[in-house]
Amino acid sequence: MKVLVNGQLIEYRKEGGGPAVLLLHGWGATLGTFDQLAAHLVKTGHTVYRFDFPGFGSSPHPGAAWSVGEYVDLTAAFIEKMKIKKLKAVAGHSFGGRVIIKGVATGKLRPERLILMAAAGIRPKPTFKKAAFTAIAKTGKVVTALPGLAGVRQKLQKKLYSAAGSSDYLQAGAMQQIFINTIKEDLTEYLDEITQPTLLVWGEHDTETPLSDGKIMQQHIASAELVVVPQAGHFVYDDDFGASVTAID
């Protein structure tokens, strides 16, 4: 289904009946990533809402270089558009968790409960790899723009960005500037503003948003519980759906 929200055409789903739950997907994913979780929540008596963020799935690119703040505003407007008066919980994975953190901390999202699965938002300390990514990304734009290199532009960029260790940036395409705007924002200071009960679900072997991020969030969010799923990675709800659902229930 489609709905116009803040001037953006949004692909969304609404299923079930009962208390409202909103699911927010991660970077590069779509609303379909939560098919299994949505089905479970519907069976347990919930109305489940989910949508493709602008620039992902079937929702067009927003047309501008958005930051996390614009995605928060879009999410708040979606809730209003759906006429959700009381949101029992909002659950998000990775980038979706980033949107939840900023949205709740600023009072724009007001769920009764938060479920953050491998949530992004903690900016890592500078490392050689991160510095290399920044330098190589800039160099890549300059080098591949030189006369005579037009034919090898894409291949050279791929090698440069892969050397920098950022497949997400390489795969971002038209979303590259939004990706940059997103990852450069550290949300640590926002965590202290969250007062709602918060469940943190983390994969033991997550390398994208490491378990140390979950522990930092647990320290800063007053009513946070951290559940670590053994052997699971970044996509914790796929790697061990049973353990993830048990924690959420």
Regions found by a protein language model. Name each.
Residues D238-D249:
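Post-His helix in hydrolase/transferase enzymes
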Residues K43, T47-A91, T246:
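Active-site loop/oxyanion-hole signature of alpha/beta-hydrolase fold enzymes
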Residues I101-T106, P111-A145:
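Flexible "cap/lid" loop of the alpha/beta hydrolase fold
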Residues Q8, R13-S58:
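Conserved HGGG/HGGXW glycine-rich cap/lid loop of the alpha/beta-hydrolase fold
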